[in-house]
């Protein structure tokens, strides 16, 4: 293609799946470019060796497979959870938060290998194309970015399957013998889209769920756990200190076994359309409940309410792909400042899809049982003071009422 005639070497974000395997072959045949592959171990729960073997089978000489699980949770997931970030009230941003990390590594590998372009497998209809590319341009304004879904002649996944068969590219099959759903997975979540899921009126089949058992079949006995926090980040489970990735993986196990973290939603994509997806975020759902609980006793009311006001904007920036933007970094600085005293332990009960906070304690707690007790508070609070407080706050309301009744 004349558009990319000057491109000699491309770093491809490669999963080993249908789309990126076809993209790899397309880059070789249509552009005549040398392809370097990058596969990230984000905790998706798959063996990555098949991706290496498939890349080798397709003639790739430079193959990068990197374990980025700790970096992912430490530098991306945990900062996001300090903000309690949720998009449109329900989505915990599992796909969104992984894209800037992948772009960061693509840019690093392009520099290391002398590549003049990067490529990704995101479609021209979705959010991921925006997330990958905004992140890449923020890190290297001169990088060329190839998005084959916007350039090639394929119009459907059926055509992709035909191309794969023509070029003898293996395609995984699901339990029903068909090409799989469009799936994204990492240590934080998994998502499924496409096929019958495109009809939002129909319940998702049970076999779509990969990370959790059904709440109906979860154990009849509740699971009790304790999560410890320091400066807003989870650091331990049941008193055992764990690395960020290990901790999230363990929470995923607890969530999976108790049917926690399933979400069926229709969301508003950045590009303007609505899409339906089935998401599973077992560990993240538990972590969010625990973080909110420890904040409830350690954050001042003003700081807590300001955080709640900033959160939707912060979540939107991540969803739209602006992780490396100055405004996200400004918000992050404010959020991180609020977390200095967010430490302690939260006790949770996990039962049939539910996460229930049943206890919270902290050496930095602002909760005072002496102030709130219904019993004798030994002079800690003079209830007579409330009269003046109410009178001053009622001043403008009484003034308005006096005017309006005339």
UniProtKB/Swiss-Prot annotation:
CDD domains: ASS. Belongs to the argininosuccinate synthase family. Type 1 subfamily. GO terms for cellular component: cytoplasm. L-citrulline binds at residues 91, 96, 127, 131, 182, 191, 267, 279. ATP binds at residues 13-21, 40, 121. The keyword Cell cycle does not apply. It catalyses: L-citrulline + L-aspartate + ATP = 2-(N(omega)-L-arginino)succinate + AMP + diphosphate + H(+). One of its GO terms (biological process) is urea cycle. Homotetramer. This is Argininosuccinate synthase. The gene is argG. PROSITE patterns: ARGININOSUCCIN_SYN_1, ARGININOSUCCIN_SYN_2. Pathway: Amino-acid biosynthesis; L-arginine biosynthesis; L-arginine from L-ornithine and carbamoyl phosphate: step 2/3. It comes from Brucella suis biovar 1 (strain 1330). SUPFAM superfamilies: Adenine nucleotide alpha hydrolases-like, Argininosuccinate synthetase, C-terminal domain. One of its GO terms (molecular function) is ATP binding. Its EC number is 6.3.4.5. It is found in: Cytoplasm. Keywords: Amino-acid biosynthesis, Arginine biosynthesis, ATP-binding, Cytoplasm, Ligase, Nucleotide-binding. Pfam families: Arginosuc_syn_C, Arginosuc_synth. Its main location: cytoplasm. PANTHER family: ARGININOSUCCINATE SYNTHASE. L-aspartate binds at residues 123, 127-128.
């Amino acid at each position: 293609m004349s558009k990319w005639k000057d491109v000699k070497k491309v770093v491809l974000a490669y999963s080993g799946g249908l789309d990126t395997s076809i993209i790899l072959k397309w880059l070789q045949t249509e552009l005549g470019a040398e392809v370097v592959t990058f596969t990230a171990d984000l905790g998706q729960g798959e063996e990555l060796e098949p991706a290496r073997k498939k890349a080798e089978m397709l003639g790739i000489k430079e193959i990068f497979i990197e374990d980025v699980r700790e970096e992912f949770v430490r530098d991306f997931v945990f900062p996001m959870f300090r903000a309690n970030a949720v998009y449109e009230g329900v989505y915990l941003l599992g796909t969104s938060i992984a894209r800037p990390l992948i772009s960061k590594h693509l840019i690093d590998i392009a520099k290391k290998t002398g590549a003049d372009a990067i490529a990704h497998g995101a479609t021209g209809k979705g959010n991921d194309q925006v997330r990958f590319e905004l992140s890449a341009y923020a890190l290297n304004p001169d990088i060329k970015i190839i998005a084959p879904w916007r350039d090639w002649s394929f119009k459907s996944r059926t055509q992709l399957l035909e191309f794969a068969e023509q070029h003898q590219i293996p395609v995984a099959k699901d339990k029903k013998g068909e090409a799989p759903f469009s799936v994204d997975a990492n240590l934080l979540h998994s998502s499924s889209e496409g096929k019958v899921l495109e009809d939002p009126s129909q319940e998702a089949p049970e076999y779509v769920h990969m990370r959790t058992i059904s709440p109906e079949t979860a154990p009849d006995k509740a699971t009790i756990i304790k999560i410890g926090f320091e400066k807003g980040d989870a650091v331990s489970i049941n008193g055992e200190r764990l690395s960020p990735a290990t901790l999230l993986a363990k929470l995923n196990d607890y969530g999976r076994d108790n049917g926690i973290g399933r979400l069926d939603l229709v969301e508003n994509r950045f590009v303007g359309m609505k899409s339906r997806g089935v998401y599973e975020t077992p560990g993240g759902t538990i972590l969010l409940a625990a973080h909110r609980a420890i904040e409830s006793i350690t954050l001042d009311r003003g700081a807590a309410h300001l955080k709640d006001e900033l959160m939707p904007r912060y979540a939107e920036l991540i969803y739209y792909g602006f992780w490396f933007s100055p405004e996200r970094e400004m918000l992050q600085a404010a959020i991180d400042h609020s977390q200095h005293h967010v430490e302690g332990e939260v006790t949770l009960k996990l039962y049939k899809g539910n996460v229930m906070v049943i206890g919270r304690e902290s050496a930095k707690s602002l909760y005072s049982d002496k102030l709130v007790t219904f019993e004798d508070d030994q002079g800690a609070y003079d209830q007579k003071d409330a009269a003046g407080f109410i009178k001053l706050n009622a001043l403008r309301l009484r003034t308005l009422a006096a005017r309006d009744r005339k």
